[in-house]
């Protein structure tokens, strides 16, 4: 019996069905004069630095909704565990829910092991979760903490990649903040020096990026203490008015005046009460 060989195209691991669907939707919307929604730019400046005895994390407090300032004093430094905190940039809902979920899982891990969690454990949980969602969770994070092995600082990207560095910045104002770090960072800094450096880095992001603004929050973590400084400084303090800037009536000359009579149609309405007896 002759064998029948039928060629079958190998099935790849990626499905392009949604790509074809999006192309059809885009063509259909274009006929009606509509455009598909585009990715929305988010704005934030977050940073962290390792000093001699621990970690200093910093963030601005402006939340934006497109080109509108939605909140002037939101907190972007999230609790993970008593010895670990995390700064979040990107989509506010994603950063909030992601850090809350990891904080809960880390508390269960701590109860199971009977000791404080390590920073590398939180980093592994975050990177595995974000990689699983392939970047669709818009959470760019700066994770910092102190455990039995010393201070640790990580940057975690939305796709799941991570870096361990002595100083990190993320967000739309990260370039300005990184310029300050590369100019003034040095190893084995004292706490006050580290706080001042992070404050200057966040201020650089605030003054050079429209998506960052308002106040500067800091979180200082060491083996002996935890300081949450909110706000640490207010670089954009509103000025005080020293006088009344109102012109008296008649100050501006009226060059021409035209009065147009309007035809108004008056309608009369009567309401008849309903007999309920």
Swiss-Prot record:
Lineage, highest ranks first: Eukaryota, Metazoa, Chordata, Craniata, Vertebrata
Reactions mediated catalytically: Cleavage of peptide bonds with very broad specificity
Enzyme Commission code(s) on record: 3.4.25.1
Propiece span(s): 1-43
Any one annotated GO CC term: nuclear body
Keyword Protease attributed: yes
Residues forming the catalytic site: 44
InterPro entries: Ntn_hydrolases_N, Pept_T1A_subB, Proteasome_bsu_C, Proteasome_bsu_CS, Proteasome_sua/b, Proteasome_suB-type
UniProt record similarity statement: Belongs to the peptidase T1B family.
PROSITE patterns recorded: PROTEASOME_BETA_1, PROTEASOME_BETA_2
Gene source species: Sus scrofa
Localization in the cell: Cytoplasm; Nucleus
GO biological process, one term: proteasome-mediated ubiquitin-dependent protein catabolic process
Gene: PSMB7
Any GO molecular function: endopeptidase activity
Origin: domain of life: Eukaryota
This protein's name: Proteasome subunit beta type-7
Functional summary from the UniProt entry: Component of the 20S core proteasome complex involved in the proteolytic degradation of most intracellular proteins. This complex plays numerous essential roles within the cell by associating with different regulatory particles. Associated with two 19S regulatory particles, forms the 26S proteasome and thus participates in the ATP-dependent degradation of ubiquitinated proteins.
Segments crossing the lipid bilayer: none
Keywords: Cytoplasm, Hydrolase, Nucleus, Protease, Proteasome, Threonine protease, Zymogen
PANTHER family: METALLOPROTEASE TLDD (PTHR32194), PROTEASOME SUBUNIT BETA TYPE-7 (PTHR32194:SF4)
Assembly and binders: The 26S proteasome consists of a 20S proteasome core and two 19S regulatory subunits. The 20S proteasome core is a barrel-shaped complex made of 28 subunits that are arranged in four stacked rings. The two outer rings are each formed by seven alpha subunits, and the two inner rings are formed by seven beta subunits. The proteolytic activity is exerted by three beta-subunits PSMB5, PSMB6 and PSMB7.
């Amino acid at each position: 019996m002759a064998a029948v060989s039928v060629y079958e195209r190998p099935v790849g691991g990626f499905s392009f069905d949604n790509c074809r669907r999006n192309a059809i939707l885009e063509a259909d919307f274009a006929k009606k004069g509509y455009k598909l929604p585009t990715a929305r730019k988010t704005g934030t400046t977050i940073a962290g630095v390792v000093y001699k005895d621990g970690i200093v994390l910093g963030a601005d407090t402006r939340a934006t909704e497109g080109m509108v300032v939605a909140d002037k004093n939101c907190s972007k430094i999230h609790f993970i565990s008593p010895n670990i905190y995390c700064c979040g940039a990107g989509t506010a809902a994603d950063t909030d829910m992601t850090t809350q979920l990891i904080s809960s899982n880390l508390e269960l891990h701590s109860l199971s092991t009977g000791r404080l969690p390590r920073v590398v454990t939180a980093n592994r949980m975050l990177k595995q979760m974000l990689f699983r969602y392939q970047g669709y969770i818009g959470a760019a994070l700066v994770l910092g903490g102190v455990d039995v092995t010393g201070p640790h600082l990580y940057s975690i990207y939305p796709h799941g990649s991570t870096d361990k560095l002595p100083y990190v910045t993320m967000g739309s104002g990260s370039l300005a903040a990184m310029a300050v770090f590369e100019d003034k960072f040095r190893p084995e800094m004292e706490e006050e020096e580290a706080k001042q450096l992070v404050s200057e880095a966040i201020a650089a992001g605030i003054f050079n990026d429209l998506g960052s603004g308002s106040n500067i929050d800091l979180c200082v973590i060491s083996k002996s203490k935890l300081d949450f400084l909110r706000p640490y400084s207010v670089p954009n303090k509103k000025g005080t008015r020293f006088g009344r800037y109102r012109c008296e009536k008649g100050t501006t000359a009226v060059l021409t005046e035209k009065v147009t009579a309007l035809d108004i149609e008056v309608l009369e309405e009567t309401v008849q009460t309903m007999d309920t007896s």
